[in-house]
Amino acid sequence: MTENEKVTRNVQGRVVSNKADKTITVLVERRVRHPLYGKYIRRSSKMQAHDEGNECQVGDVVTIEQCRPISKSKAWRLVKVLERAAQ
């Protein structure tokens, strides 16, 4: 039999808030094609992620991955900071 490996979903986004303790809000943008007209449209989602070390600042570009639910609104955790915001 094959081993049961979890496939985690990773996304990249920009931190828009870090006001809560150990929590960041990440804005994830994606491009989708309009079904009738074919034009590409930007769609965005705000996700709350767990930041154990409070290391992120507003404007950072980060990678987050899906995990077990940590609270009512958090089911993502910070993997790494890709790019720091200009201070």
From Swiss-Prot:
NCBIfam families registered for this protein in UniProt: PRK05610.1 (NF004123), uS17_bact (TIGR03635)
Source species: Alkalilimnicola ehrlichii (strain ATCC BAA-1101 / DSM 17681 / MLHE-1)
GO cellular component terms given for this protein: cytosolic small ribosomal subunit
Keywords assigned by UniProt, alphabetized: Ribonucleoprotein, Ribosomal protein, RNA-binding, rRNA-binding
HAMAP family named among the record's database cross-references: Ribosomal_uS17_B
Keyword Ribonucleoprotein: yes
Function: One of the primary rRNA binding proteins, it binds specifically to the 5'-end of 16S ribosomal RNA.
Family as reported in the entry's similarity comment: Belongs to the universal ribosomal protein uS17 family.
Name of a matching Pfam family: Ribosomal_S17
SUPFAM superfamilies (alphabetical): Nucleic acid-binding proteins
Entry-linked InterPro entries: NA-bd_OB-fold, Ribosomal_uS17, Ribosomal_uS17_bact/chlr, Ribosomal_uS17_CS
Protein name: Small ribosomal subunit protein uS17
Gene3D superfamilies reported for this sequence: Nucleic acid-binding proteins (2.40.50.140)
A single GO BP: translation
Quaternary assembly: Part of the 30S ribosomal subunit.
